[in-house]
UniProtKB/Swiss-Prot annotation:
Top-level lineage group: Bacteria
InterPro entries on file: Ribosomal_uS11 (IPR001971), Ribosomal_uS11_bac-type (IPR019981), Ribosomal_uS11_CS (IPR018102), Ribosomal_uS11_sf (IPR036967)
Family of the protein in this entry: Belongs to the universal ribosomal protein uS11 family.
Organism from which the protein derives: Nostoc sp. (strain PCC 7120 / SAG 25.82 / UTEX 2576)
Residues making up the signal peptide according to the UniProt record: none
Disulfide cross-links: none
SUPFAM superfamilies membership: Translational machinery components
Name the UniProt record assigns to this protein: Small ribosomal subunit protein uS11
Biological process according to GO: translation
Listed GO MF terms: rRNA binding; structural constituent of ribosome
Lineage, top ranks: Bacteria, Bacillati, Cyanobacteriota, Cyanophyceae, Nostocales
Gene Ontology, cellular component aspect: ribonucleoprotein complex; ribosome
UniProt subunit comment: Part of the 30S ribosomal subunit. Interacts with proteins S7 and S18. Binds to IF-3.
Entry-linked Gene3D superfamilies: Ribosomal protein S11
Amino acid sequence: MARQPTKKSGSKKQKRNVPNGMAYIQSTFNNSIVTITDQNGDVISWASAGSSGFKGAKKGTPFAAQTAAESAARRAIDQGMRQIEVMVSGPGAGRETAIRALQGAGLEITLIRDITPIPHNGCRPPKRRRV
């Protein structure tokens, strides 16, 4: 006799009501990643330019960062988020557009902080490109 297929007991995402949290925008030259967390740092939603459907060099564009930020913000608003503090990291092109996209999606931004790590003369940087 054939065995009945058993359901896997995976953890189902429950909808929690989180009114305010933090948004971390990591913007490099090659990609942009937007992570939205609650006050404790537990991830509520995230999106990147790659997960939004962009490939190759297009991932580093401001439009790709905007699309990723809108996607992450939409999922956070579904969880009940209203206010966020924005932490921006990295030298990429999508920094400002991602912040504007979060604001345009309906989230109220209470703080913007640049947390880009700056060395106090640490590692030697890569050599300059000669094209």
